[in-house]
Amino acid sequence: MRLAFFVKDVATEIDEYATTRLARAALQRGHEVWYVGAEDVELGESDGQLVARAHAAEFTKGDTLESFMRRIKERDIERIVMDDLDALFLRNESVDDLQERPWASPLGVVFGQMLEARGVTVVNDPKSLIRAASKLYLEEFPEKIRPRSLVTRDPEAIKRFVGTVGRSVVKPLYGGRGRNVFMIEDETEANLAQMTEAVLQDGYAIVQEFVEGGEDGDARIFLLEGKILERDGKLAAFRRVPTGTDLRANISVGGRSVPLDIGEVERGVIDAMSEKLVADGMFFVGIDVIGDKVVEINAESTGGIQSVEWLYEIDVCPTVIEALERRTGSKP
């Protein structure tokens, strides 16, 4: 299988990313692997082919993830014809580019749709990823598995919503890594105007009714083709616990990961989501769950696989690559 990982910028990739582990798994199964950054693609004026200035990946005996990634960056750039790929794995985070490089933000789904039309297997499905990259995507799932919410740019509407439902969380509709996420106790919150203003600087806000138990963190569960990702009987899921008084459990803002036992409640949530995720082509996603409610769907470059590896001493990435092999009809 000729596989390329489409990332934000090859130069900023690091060994701890889930993408690094996915690339390692693909190489260890005998596949050809390339890294392509958002600014590395060209459309040939004569033949109309999509061409990329790509970095070849090679995992050798004795490599650590750090040395593996270092050598990817050090290798000479090679030109590859992306039309000839078997699969393209979209691992860029368009939300990260919205502020500093807005021109780069949509390129994953744009190039992905072009290549899909040319016969390349693209995951996650770029046509659906346009919606799924937004927190609005959660609103397409059954009401019973999501908190009450409001999407708006009206500060007064936010205040009215909080006055109706009480304790709430407000965050940017397009955002991640815990940036500009605030807890609002009630509509009389002293800093409500400042918090709302900070969130609305990033565009639309989404306000969610606070889910009881959220102060203790959330569960990050990885789903592959609508089912819990697992390897050798171990499930790819963990609990993210916030530190101190910070409600955000994101690892990127200091949250810590602890083992999680998947119970009937979590399985019921997944069952309610599975059919739609599969229909939408959401091959590999992470969901954040509190109690019986999903508070976020991470459909674009979902991270945290390293926590699964550390907690359970298992590499689940080969299971992801095996599923991709089945999709492309490739053999290891």
Q: Positions of the model-derived regions?
A:
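Extreme N-terminal starter segment of soluble prokaryotic enzymes
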Residues: M1-A4
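ATP-dependent carboxylate activation and anion-phosphoryl transfer catalytic cores
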Residues: F6-V7, L260-P332
